[in-house]
Amino acid sequence: MVGTINESMQNMKIGAKETAQSAKQGIKNAGQSSSKTARDVMGNPVPGSYTAGNTANDGDSSYASSKNLPGNADIGATSSERTAYAAPQRAAVDTSNVSPPSTQTGGYASKDTTSTYEGAQPLSSQSSRSSNYTNVKITATQNNVDALTGAPIRIVTTTNARIQPDEKTLQDLLEQRQVALREAREAEEELQRARQYNDRSTSEALELEARAKKAAQDAELASERAREAQSSIERSASLREKQAREEAERAATALREAELKHRLAQANADVDVANSKLDIALKNEAAWKAERESSLAHQKAVIDSARAELERARHEAAVADATYKKEHYEYNALVAELEERNDNTLRTASIREAEARNLEVHMEDTLKDARMRSRNATEQVEVVKREINSEIDVYRSSVEKTKAELASYQKGLPSQKEACDRELDDATRALQAAFQDRFNAAKLRVNQFDVDSRQQLAMLTKKVRDAEDAEEKYRISCHQREEEITRCATQAYDAVKAAEKRNETIAEAARAKENEAKDLYSKAESITQDLNAKRSHPPQPANLDYSSAIQRAQERLTLEESKLTDLRTAEPSQYVNDVEVARRALRDAQAEQSKVESEYNSVKGSKLYTTEPVHPHAVTTNEPTDVSTKSKSAAYHYPATTETVSSKAARSATTPAYVGGATKTPSTTKAVESTPSTLPTSASTNAAATTTTKKPKAAKSTAVRDDVSSASSDSDKGTTGLGKSESKSSRKERRSSTSSGHGLMNNVRHALGMSNK
């Protein structure tokens, strides 16, 4: 059962992970699409636009368009990618370069300035790179048109969604989308305030119109004086009149082109809005699908839990049955074991009693045998002692007898020697007296007696010595035999003592066995009591009914499976219809864009001048007079949406919030703004103050990608590009309908033959 529950929980976790991963992948794809759109917008501005760093220091407006290069688009993309995971930020930029008319002699002295309103600054990238979050960038774009100049203003609202990898991801994403929409509405309100601020320039336009009327009156008076002048002046006046008509026609064409360009910008803005709505609809659809998959995974997990509960109920019923059987088998085994233990205990007790009796009998027999052997040894010792004593007495009597013979012989020896000496003396005297022969015979007998006596003494002495030696040897042997008999008697006595001691040990063992037998009998009695108690209380089956629990688990499983079927057969969400509506709106906007662009291409680039102006008061500026080499994006352009942190920090302290303010930026701010706007975002605010103005190496190129090509580069959203086949030269000619210096009114004054005073 535990394995089944673990498996179901594992499957549930895997399903939730797959759902979260699919939702994250969809959100990531949407974020990549939005990031790509933002990079295209920031790196590829539309025709007529230039970034905050497009103001040249040498006063040549021809460099205004060369600062925004295709090569810088990559840098802009890199900047966008580096700030893709920052905090939500908003930027409304209007780079209209319409400047109020100024009275001058010899040209214009001031250059166009650019101001930017910025939203929240990005957070530190370190805090947004946490491994516990998945960062998704959501970009919402709104396009509006300035009421005075007709310049489009693009509001880009960027929200960085920091998604946690858990089941609250979708809800957090929806809340962050609401935050992004709310910031877009706030940006729109700021745009309204910017328009109100720009309305103050209307009075300047009226003043310019009054000056134009006054200049027209002055021109009429001059024309009257010219008709009164010489014929050469009349020819010059007729030539100026012809040029004025041509310039008027050119101005009308420029106005038409400006109107079409405004419509084209509006169409491009509508396409961007449709793309944004399509992105939002696709994200909503992906979020709905992810939520649906999450609900399905949750319901499957609930079904797995119900199935596990059913299996658990069945398992508990089986466990209860098995428990009863186990207890019954254990009871039977315990009764049999108790019976066997009782029999074994009684048998062992009887064996121990028999062993104790045998030990007692063995102890008595051993003691009797030892005592008998000890008594026999003692009797044998006494017999041997008596025999030894009698034999010793015999040897002693023989020795005494020999000693007595020796003593009697030695005792009679002096008398015999004296007798022999007397006889020798007698013989000697007789010899001396009469018989020499007798003396010799007596001397011979004396010598013989000495020899015999010595031999007899030696023999007797040897006999005595031999008798003593024999007595000594016999005494020694008797002593050894006595010692051996004594040792045997001692051993017999020791055996008796050992037998007595052993009998004590045997007696203790016999008593221990008797005690063990008593304990075994008492144990057998307790076992008999336990056996009787077990037999009187056999195990009973558990009175638990598990069928109701199994039925409830089965009903819950059926109910959850029906809920899963309802979820699978549910109607598709409204987000699918919203996607279709957004796609139709995008197709309509692209069709309108194609229509306006074709009309604009048919009107742009009209060349109406046939002669050069010869008015003595022709416009002279400090800029090059070659109109074809100047930027044609002075009056109508798109704002750049990518700016460096350093330029933002430098302008936020010195410039007004919107374009058109009367406050002029200091030279330090100009130096900061003249840097390329596509610097990496890692540049700090301190570095902005020391940044020197450097022109990019690719500044020779004057080609700028228009909004149509930037919209068509977003191929992953299905946007149809309309300007891919246009060359750089055609895009340059597209901006040739307006004046390069200071907007449409300069063209009107030039066409009317008026000079700036």
From Swiss-Prot:
GO terms for biological process: long-chain fatty acid biosynthetic process. One of its GO terms (molecular function) is ATP binding. Residues 1-131, 224-244, 589-633, 657-757 are annotated as: Disordered. Keywords: ATP-binding, Coiled coil, Nucleotide-binding. Transmembrane segments: none annotated. Residues 166-604 form a coiled coil. Residues 589-598 have a biased composition (Basic and acidic residues). Residues 1-11, 19-36, 51-69, 94-118, 619-632 have a biased composition (Polar residues). ATP binds at G718, T719, T720, G721, L722, G723, K724, S725. Residues 674-693 have a biased composition (Low complexity). The keyword Glycoprotein does not apply. May be involved in the metabolism of very long-chain fatty acid-containing phospholipids (VLCFA-PL). This is Protein lsd90. It comes from Schizosaccharomyces pombe (strain 972 / ATCC 24843). The gene is lsd90.
